[in-house]
């Protein structure tokens, strides 16, 4: 089997370094390129320097050159650079795995449009456990559909720039969808001051940013006399990286927009 050639965007970032390691660990993939922004101090260094690997791939800011020798790009950066990389992937007929969060509606529309021409796996979280949690939440919300207050609590490291996390929002979307609600209409983000009694139709969000928390997410369903809490805690970024590489292998040869539920066979298509 010819190894799948994978490039990593943001290769010197916290997630990018782990992605380099994950590609190296997978028996069916090979690192074909590593991207960083112009001016990065890491340009020219071996992509594996930070994790003790010698990959033979130098970190570059030449997107065209990197994509020309790659089958797929994995991007866990920020919305603006991800959308630029997305357009390049369409031009070069390179598939893309998007783990970036914080897109606005226009950004999501651009991803949907690009999926008509290339294969995209776009997910809020690439952990197998988190995606199984999404699947479970759909069932739980359908059963606990009356008389339960729903809150989503998430925690991440001090460096995370968007809140609530993409995973927390996806949990909210899954729950709202199961209940026949529109999350944009029923979400409450944080509470302060005299808020009055809780509206039973709302889904609340609370955010923690502290230390080096990799990712903690809890969906709470509470009523008189009982609470149901569904929690996922990530202890290492490798769980996300390994899932992203799995998605890259899965989407090879496909066109269209997919998520991690598709990769794991949890969606009925």
UniProtKB/Swiss-Prot annotation:
Keywords: Amino-acid biosynthesis, Cytoplasm, Diaminopimelate biosynthesis, Lysine biosynthesis, NAD, NADP, Oxidoreductase
Pathway this chain belongs to: Amino-acid biosynthesis; L-lysine biosynthesis via DAP pathway; (S)-tetrahydrodipicolinate from L-aspartate: step 4/4
Domain of life of the source: Bacteria
GO BP of this protein: diaminopimelate biosynthetic process; lysine biosynthetic process via diaminopimelate
Gene Ontology cellular component list: cytosol
The enzyme's E.C. designation: 1.17.1.8
Keyword presence, Methyltransferase: no
Residues at which (S)-2,3,4,5-tetrahydrodipicolinate binds: 157, 166-167
Top EC class for this record: oxidoreductase
InterPro entries, per database record: DapB_C, DapB_N, DapB_N_CS, DHDPR_bac, NAD(P)-bd_dom_sf
GO molecular function, one term: NAD binding
Catalytic activity, as annotated: (S)-2,3,4,5-tetrahydrodipicolinate + NAD(+) + H2O = (2S,4S)-4-hydroxy-2,3,4,5-tetrahydrodipicolinate + NADH + H(+); (S)-2,3,4,5-tetrahydrodipicolinate + NADP(+) + H2O = (2S,4S)-4-hydroxy-2,3,4,5-tetrahydrodipicolinate + NADPH + H(+)
Subcellular location(s) per record: Cytoplasm
Binding site for NAD(+): 10-15, 36, 99-101, 123-126
Chief subcellular location: cytoplasm
Assigned protein family: Belongs to the DapB family.
Function statement: Catalyzes the conversion of 4-hydroxy-tetrahydrodipicolinate (HTPA) to tetrahydrodipicolinate.
Protein name: 4-hydroxy-tetrahydrodipicolinate reductase
Species this chain originates from: Neisseria gonorrhoeae (strain ATCC 700825 / FA 1090)
Gene assigned in the entry: dapB
């Amino acid at each position: 089997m010819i190894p799948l050639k994978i490039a990593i965007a943001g290769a010197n970032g916290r997630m990018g370094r782990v992605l380099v390691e994950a590609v190296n660990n997978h028996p069916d993939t090979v690192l074909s390129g590593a991207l960083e922004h112009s001016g990065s101090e890491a340009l020219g260094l071996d992509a594996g320097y930070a994790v003790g690997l010698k990959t033979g791939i130098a970190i570059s800011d030449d997107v065209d050159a990197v994509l020309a020798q790659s089958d797929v790009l994995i991007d866990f950066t920020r919305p603006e650079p991800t959308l630029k990389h997305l357009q390049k992937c369409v031009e070069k007929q390179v598939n893309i795995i998007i783990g970036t969060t914080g897109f606005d509606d226009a950004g999501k529309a651009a991803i949907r449009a690009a999926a008509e021409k290339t294969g995209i796996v776009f997910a809020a979280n690439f952990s197998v456990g988190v995606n199984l949690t999404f699947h479970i939440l759909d069932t739980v919300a359908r059963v606990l559909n009356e008389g339960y207050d729903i809150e989503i609590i998430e925690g991440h490291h001090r460096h995370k720039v968007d809140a609530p996390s993409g995973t927390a929002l996806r949990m909210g979307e899954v729950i709202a969808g199961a209940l026949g609600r529109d999350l944009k209409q029923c979400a409450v983000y944080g509470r302060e001051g005299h808020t009055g009694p809780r509206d039973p139709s709302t889904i609340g969000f609370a955010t923690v940013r502290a230390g080096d928390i990799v990712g903690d997410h809890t969906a709470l369903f509470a009523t008189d006399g009982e609470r149901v809490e569904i929690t996922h805690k990530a202890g290492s970024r490798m769980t996300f990286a390994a899932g992203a590489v799995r998605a890259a292998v899965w989407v090879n040869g496909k066109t269209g927009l997919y998520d991690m539920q598709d990769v794991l066979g949890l969606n009925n298509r």
